[in-house]
């Protein structure tokens, strides 16, 4: 309850002090969740998690005080209407970026991730990947871009480089794993790399894709971790080798797994495709070479999700003949997520309608405060146009 309340506080705070207090309050229940109910190496994982996140966010209090001294207020909306010197923006943005990059996490601040995700109980892994990872991305959108726009533009190449490294490195690490929890953990590194990349493209396709990808990644990754938990109750193992040949004996379970795995590598028609497609379009709009470098990350996702799926479905079965298929409680848990995977993949207009007004305001305000011309096609703010483009129809905008 404390953890969920603090998470809600972070995403709803309009005051820097409250934002900071809720941000720090999340650490204690998360540490206890890992250290008390985690796996065999839970103490090491919990300590590593709290040391990394404390090191990343300790200086955030300095930023909070600095904005109060310079801007005369803790109110985020009031500070957004003020202009700060470039030097002030740069050092405050660097501190904020460090805290947010650790929380996402971005390469090279990701080394706490496999230990925390791997040792946390399934409920903890779901919260870490589906919700807490989004705090860093939200921090960039709520504080980084509005309060320090010129610094955000100045450091954008560095953040983009870190994001691309996260996408490619996370994909390679996920492909090399034999543990299902670690595969999903490293896949989150790659997916969140796409999110941060989309934010720092500074075009509407990129930012739209980033926000909708945050929603979709939470659904898909949460579902995959839930299925790993169901699997562990039956086999007692998180290893691929301990869960082979399930397709014949638990077909309903593997049907759900296949759907969420395909969503995990952004197969067209699933929810993750929408955000990833928009981010790739935004990347090619920003720079053709940037788009070309990012594309292999999407291909890696297919490789690391299809490999375990193939082995778990058609491999040589072990003790799966004794298993029962899904219970009523498990159906009730997974059906809503399966519905969202398909609905948001086939009809993304629901999310686009909700987010477009805020994103339009964010991008236009950012453009007006940065002394460069950013490409914004106002037709692209129509969720109908974007939804049609995803279905292959002509939009008349800049999308192919």
List each language-model region with its residue ranges.
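Hydrophobic transmembrane alpha-helices and their helix-loop junctions in integral membrane proteins
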Residues: 4-19, 28-310
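Cytoplasmic/organellar membrane-interface segments at the starts of transmembrane helices
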Residues: 250-252, 305-400
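Short phosphate-coordinating micro-motif centered on Lys-Gly-acidic
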Residues: 24
